[in-house]
Design a protein with these regions (language model features):
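Acidic catalytic/metal-coordinating carboxylates
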Residues: 106, 132-138
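Short helix-start
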Residues: 11-16, 37-64
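Acidic, metal-coordinating helix/loop segments flanking the phosphotransfer/catalytic sites
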Residues: 103-121
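Alpha4 helix (beta4-alpha4-beta5 surface) of REC/receiver domains from two-component response regulators
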Residues: 135, 158-175, 186
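The feature encodes the CheY-like receiver
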Residues: 129, 147, 159
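C-terminal output helix
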Residues: 179-188
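Two-component/phosphorelay signaling modules centered on CheY-like receiver
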Residues: 83-102
């Protein structure tokens, strides 16, 4: 779902709200049913609709980032301390794939940035200078607000077998460095396809 600012709807479905807020559609339904998020039901149907104005009010009240609101684009956070890799990934993901990209150059900054931007996907280098990538993934998995965030391991040192072993232990995919543009985009698409 891509929505540009000029095409932004006045009323959104629970699925659209879920994608913007990076939560499951059932979470949006719970917000609606509890009265936390104001909207209305389609007469004769169980379908719910959320006016854009109410969603913005809700997001501001709960400190949610509004950056996903205008585009509905997939939000990707790159966590890597190698500047050349970050630069290439950022250029590819923003320019070619039209993703919204945030960058964190340390495990510490990854926590702060993830909390603020609530990415759909985190591309996580396993060999950060300040912390092991597994610890960052563990922190993401323990944060209730990031339960739907997909974590993709990146490494040039680990073997294919070691990287595959990470699947199911907090990671949703992996990229072996060096990788090409198609591999990066395909891995992100594969990881997000299950949820969205």
């Amino acid at each position: 779902m891509q929505m540009s600012a000029s095409k932004l709807k006045d009323v959104l479905t629970t699925g659209e709200v879920a994608k913007i807020c990076n939560v499951a559609p059932r979470t949006v339904s719970k917000w609606f049913d509890s009265g936390t998020l104001t909207g209305y039901r389609i007469p004769g149907s169980k379908d719910r609709r959320i006016p854009l104005s109410q969603l913005i009010k809700f997001m501001k009240h709960h400190g949610m980032p509004l950056n996903g609101l205008m585009t509905g684009a997939t939000r990707v956070m790159i966590v890597d301390d190698e500047a050349d890799i970050v630069e290439v990934l950022e250029r590819i993901l923003e320019g070619e794939a039209k993703y919204e990209v945030e960058v964190a150059k340390s495990g510490f900054m990854a926590g702060i940035t993830a909390e603020k931007s609530r990415p759909h996907v985190i591309l996580l280098d396993m060999h950060l200078k300040d912390i092991d990538g597994r610890e960052v993934a563990k922190a993401v998995r323990s944060n209730p607000d990031l339960q739907l965030t997909k974590v993709i391991a990146m490494s040039g040192r680990m073997s294919e077998v070691e990287l595959k072993a990470l699947i199911g232990s907090g990671f949703d995919g992996y990229l072996k460095k060096p990788f090409n543009v198609r591999q990066v985009i395909q891995t992100i698409e594969d990881a997000t396809h299950v949820t969205y």
